[in-house]
Amino acid sequence: MKPYTQTTGLVAPLDRANVDTDQIIPKQFLKSIKRTGFGPNLFDEWRYLDVGQPGQDNSKRPLNPDFVLNQPRYQGASVLLARENFGCGSSREHAPWALDEYGFRTVIAPSYADIFFNNSFKNGLLPIILPEAEVDELFRQVEANEGYQLSIDLAAQTVTRPDGKVLGFEVDPFRKHCLLNGLDDIGLTLQDADAIRAFEDGYRQQQPWLFR
């Protein structure tokens, strides 16, 4: 997992509440458990004018010109600004995978569905919670200023606007440690690899009959 320390990125505003995981990555694309290949199908039903299917050449599909991620001013965005209850619906790690592979490192919203919120941290995506009034103001500023960027400092737990105003956010210390150091569940386990091997060697000596 890529470490998350500091980043400055273009903001894309997704002005819709209660965006569920099937809208983030539709169910027909969930057949793979690899973490790659989902970016082109992020928000598939909104980005394209046809019905997407696995294995399609997305470069040949008709784009929906009204969808925010298809607008030229938001190309290359790495910060997604969203509304309340983002990531609701069924549990699927494919949702943060798709957001990450598209290029988003950060989502900012007033609230999230619990399972999506937890899955995001485990997959290198930082979901920031800000008060609704601050999110409303960010939407106004993003829409009024082309090329609007935010700077996020995870260690300091701050979001800095272009006008210099600093917004603080809360994050669980353990989740913060994992993101700063790029540690997913496998990475955390491998930190104790020596202790695990020592236990296995000792257990093999104590219970040799189990290994015959």
Swiss-Prot record:
Instruction: Please state the pathway this protein functions in, per its UniProt record.
Output: Amino-acid biosynthesis; L-leucine biosynthesis; L-leucine from 3-methyl-2-oxobutanoate: step 2/4
Entry keyword Amino-acid biosynthesis:
yes
Question: In the record, which residues are listed under signal peptide?
Answer: none
Q: Name one GO biological process term.
A: L-leucine biosynthetic process
What does the UniProt keyword field contain?
Answer: Amino-acid biosynthesis, Branched-chain amino acid biosynthesis, Leucine biosynthesis, Lyase
Q: Which reaction does it catalyse?
A: (2R,3S)-3-isopropylmalate = (2S)-2-isopropylmalate
- An example molecular function term from Gene Ontology annotations: 3-isopropylmalate dehydratase activity
Which family does the record assign?
Belongs to the LeuD family. LeuD type 1 subfamily.
Q: What does this protein do?
A: Catalyzes the isomerization between 2-isopropylmalate and 3-isopropylmalate, via the formation of 2-isopropylmaleate.
What NCBIfam families does the annotation carry? leuD (TIGR00171), PRK01641.1 (NF002458)
What protein does this entry describe?
Answer: 3-isopropylmalate dehydratase small subunit
In its UniProt entry, the species of origin is given as: Pseudomonas aeruginosa (strain ATCC 15692 / DSM 22644 / CIP 104116 / JCM 14847 / LMG 12228 / 1C / PRS 101 / PAO1)
